[in-house]
């Protein structure tokens, strides 16, 4: 037996029923005061801590809570505030904090992008002229709160300095170390205050260590953590990595810290190999992330216990920590909120609270022997077996179709240069055609009507009539705005992935399986629990109805396989590429149904393509090849004059531009406005032969852009892209915006387009 310690790395902020989201939005809407917001969120925070305490977690994280984002928290802790927000140098107010994230009338929001290869977004630090100083030791506040209110000796959590700076913008390789030298004493101040307050442990997250980087950068980590160790020798620092294995295992485990946190789930088996090959320092704790913190499936506890027993052979007794692979921020709170799920599926699930229980079971099994938790192990064993052996995961028709993929055509009949002429011939669009990305605002009335329908308070006929009325209203709005290619608005959809999950076999929606995407925006990823199959038309009815209302083309709107995969909780018993191809075959039937019913412009969105890239570049090519294959599997069977669109967002594209072209979509739209033109520079350096729309304004902020701002974005793009290839559109879908600001922004977009179009037509003459 091995003496082990249980630990957690972070807990979901949302609350079991999204109470955190509602509190934030009430504050933003002015219906509660700041004092009330602080009171409501404190209740949620303490409830989360108490649950972890009650479930037997020894090292409970504190300071993982945030009002928006942990990276933004780090920025305001150290006073890294963009000048446009006119910060006075004191402690950052909550209003300024939210302005940085959301923007305000006279200041655009800071850029937002994906947290490594997850669907969580962070606010990008703006590091130009950064002079860090501690304005607010949030970690100390949360540590003292947990101690005072609950008697919890918590483990404060910080985003590590190197990861923080690597995630920022405004510094280059030359200035990086100079900037790092400025941050070290600021971090030391935080750590000294924690040590003085009695903190025993602090968790410093450095997921950058799990990426691919130059080995010379290890010296930066040695410098930082030696400074910390010297400054706070009595504070146990857990240097936490996650999302991948360590390229420089030997160097990392010998850094001057008390504990090293390693992901043993998303490491492709590399970590245990490194441990066997190189051992582990006797004086350090190994925090083994063995419970999957990014997916919702129940752990095979027998396999996890076997792995932990193997790990324990290389770790000094009493120095093995059992924990999730990463923060539980990325999974829903509890499966106890899902009593209506199929019994076999429910049995196979493990949300945040259940993962804490798995950690406790494994810790007890190591410390007291497996027989001490024999009943718990048997229950888990039976549940995992029942799901794997169920008919859900053994659909012979689907498995036969996958086996015969070599017989399925995955290329369009004509090359782009030839088929685009056929598309232009019937579309007859002007220079710089305008469109939107898909969704329009889901007003309180839309959400209430859907909720009433789901509760059975209104009939299917009443609900469908409402959706048609709202669709017709927005078709008229788009025509009045003079948009060229229309959309139906997606009023029937809660989410661009969940909606498809409700219509395809092998998917299961949840009621309260919410996770944070950005700010108060929560998504409810469907569960892909079994083999995926087409069972009914998904989008045809709404698309055909919308097209019947107008002579302008209306886009059919689908979500592509890789985005569905990346924004779902995917079964973990088969490779993701197999699931993506199952989804591709199912969606191919939907694309064909749209085309059969007269929809000749079909958008197949792949916004999450880049975010799913493996952190190790050596693994990129297979992922990208698989992504291209599943996309073409979805789209390749259409006629040559049917125009395929796709959309991507939150992405750096310079390193995957060949993949984007290989998708062979006729038109791609890309989010660009929040990156302030950086993506445009990619197209200044490469030749892209298909049509493209670079988003001309940021939809994530309530701020309405000016005509001049939009024109500046258009003109900048036209320096890189041929005018005849260029489309004009917002960055992303408009579902989360309010109607007045949406219409105002689109009016500005159309006005800006017409003025620039007129300029170009004069030049052509």
UniProtKB/Swiss-Prot annotation:
Active-site residues per Swiss-Prot or TrEMBL entry: 700 (proton donor)
EC annotation from Swiss-Prot or TrEMBL: 2.1.1.14
Reactions it catalyzes: 5-methyltetrahydropteroyltri-L-glutamate + L-homocysteine = tetrahydropteroyltri-L-glutamate + L-methionine
Top-level taxon of origin: Bacteria
Record note on cofactor: Binds 1 zinc ion per subunit.
Cofactor (UniProt): Zn(2+)
Source species taxonomy: Bacteria, Bacillati, Bacillota, Bacilli, Bacillales
CDD domains per record: CIMS_C_terminal_like, CIMS_N_terminal_like
Gene name linked to the record: metE
Family per record: Belongs to the vitamin-B12 independent methionine synthase family.
Name under which the protein is recorded: 5-methyltetrahydropteroyltriglutamate--homocysteine methyltransferase
GO terms under biological process: methionine biosynthetic process; methylation
Organism this protein belongs to: Listeria monocytogenes serotype 4b (strain CLIP80459)
């Amino acid at each position: 037996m091995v003496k082990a310690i249980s630990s957690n790395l972070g807990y979901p902020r949302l609350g079991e029923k999204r109470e955190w989201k509602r509190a934030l939005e009430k504050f933003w809407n002015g219906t509660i005061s700041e004092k009330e917001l602080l009171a409501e969120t404190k209740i949620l925070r303490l409830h989360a801590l108490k649950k972890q305490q009650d479930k037997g977690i020894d090292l409970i994280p504190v300071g993982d809570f945030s009002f928006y984002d942990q990276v933004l928290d780090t920025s305001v802790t150290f006073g890294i505030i963009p000048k446009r927000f006119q910060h006075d140098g004191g402690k950052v107010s909550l209003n300024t904090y939210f302005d940085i994230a959301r923007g305000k009338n006279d200041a655009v929001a800071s850029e937002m992008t994906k947290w490594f290869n997850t669907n969580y977004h962070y606010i990008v630090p703006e590091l130009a002229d950064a002079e860090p100083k501690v304005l607010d030791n949030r970690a100390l506040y949360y540590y003292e709160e947990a101690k005072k209110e609950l008697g919890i000796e918590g483990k404060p959590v910080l985003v590590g300095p190197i990861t923080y700076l690597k995630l920022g913008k405004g510094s280059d390789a030359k200035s990086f170390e100079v900037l790092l030298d400025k941050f070290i004493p600021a971090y030391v101040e935080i750590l000294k205050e924690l040590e003085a307050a009695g903190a025993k442990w602090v968790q410093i997250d450095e997921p950058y260590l799990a990426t691919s980087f130059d080995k010379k950068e290890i010296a930066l980590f040695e410098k930082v953590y030696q400074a910390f160790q010297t400054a706070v020798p009595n504070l146990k620092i857990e240097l936490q990595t996650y999302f991948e294995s360590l390229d420089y295992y030997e160097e990392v485990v010998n850094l001057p810290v008390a504990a090293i946190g390693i992901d043993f789930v998303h490491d492709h088996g590399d970590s245990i190999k490194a441990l066997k090959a190189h051992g582990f320092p006797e004086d350090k704790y190994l925090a083994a992330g063995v419970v999957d913190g990014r997916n919702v499936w129940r752990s095979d506890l027998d396999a996890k216990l076997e792995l932990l027993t193997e790990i324990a052979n290389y770790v000094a007794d009493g120095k093995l920590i059992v924990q999730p692979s990463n923060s539980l921020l990325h999974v829903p709170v509890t499966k106890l909120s899902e009593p209506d799920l199929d019994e076999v599926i429910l049995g196979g699930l493990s949300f945040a609270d259940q993962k804490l229980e798995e950690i406790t079971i494994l810790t007890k099994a190591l410390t007291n022997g497996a027989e001490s938790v024999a009943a718990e192990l048997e229950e888990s064993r039976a549940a995992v077996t029942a799901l794997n052996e169920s008919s859900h995961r053994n659909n012979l028709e689907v498995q036969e179709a996958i086996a015969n993929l070599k017989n399925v055509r995955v290329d369009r009949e004509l090359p782009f240069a030839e088929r685009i002429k056929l598309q232009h011939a019937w579309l007859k669009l002007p220079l710089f055609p305008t469109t939107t990305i898909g969704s329009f605002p889901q007003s309180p009335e839309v959400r209430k009507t859907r909720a009433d329908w789901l509760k059975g308070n209104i009939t299917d006929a009443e609900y469908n009539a409402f959706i048609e009325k709202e669709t017709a209203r927005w078709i008229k709005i788009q025509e009045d705005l003079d948009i060229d290619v229309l959309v139906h608005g997606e009023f029937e959809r809660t989410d661009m992935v969940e909606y498809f999950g409700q219509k395809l076999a092998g998917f299961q929606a949840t009621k309260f399986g919410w996770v944070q995407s950005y700010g108060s925006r929560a998504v409810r990823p469907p569960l892909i629990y079994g083999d995926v199959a087409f069972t009914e038309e998904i989008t045809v009815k709404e698309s055909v109805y919308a097209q019947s209302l107008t002579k302008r083309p209306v886009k059919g709107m689908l979500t592509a396989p890789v985005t569905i995969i990346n924004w779902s909780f995917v079964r973990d018993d088969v490779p993701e590429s197999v699931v993506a191809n199952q989804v591709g075959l199912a969606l191919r039937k939907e694309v064909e149904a749209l085309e059969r019913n007269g929809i000749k412009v079909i958008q197949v969105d792949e916004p999450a393509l880049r975010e799913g890239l493996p952190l190790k570049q050596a693994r990129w090519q297979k992922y990208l090849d698989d992504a291209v294959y599943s996309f073409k599997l979805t789209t390749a069977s259409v006629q040559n004059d049917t125009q395929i669109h796709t959309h991507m967002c939150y992405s750096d594209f310079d390193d995957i531009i060949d993949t984007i072209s290989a998708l062979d979509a006729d038109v791609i739209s890309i989010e660009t406005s929040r990156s302030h033109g950086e993506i445009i520079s990619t197209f200044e350096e490469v030749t892209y032969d298909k049509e493209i729309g670079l988003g001309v304004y940021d939809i994530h902020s309530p701020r309405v852009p000016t005509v001049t701002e939009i024109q500046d974005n258009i003109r900048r793009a036209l320096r890189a892209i041929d005018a005849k290839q260029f489309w004009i559109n917002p960055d992303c879908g408009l579902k989360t915006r309010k109607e007045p600001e949406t219409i105002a922004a689109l009016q500005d977009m159309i006005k800006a387009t017409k003025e620039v179009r007129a300029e170009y037509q004069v030049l052509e003459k």
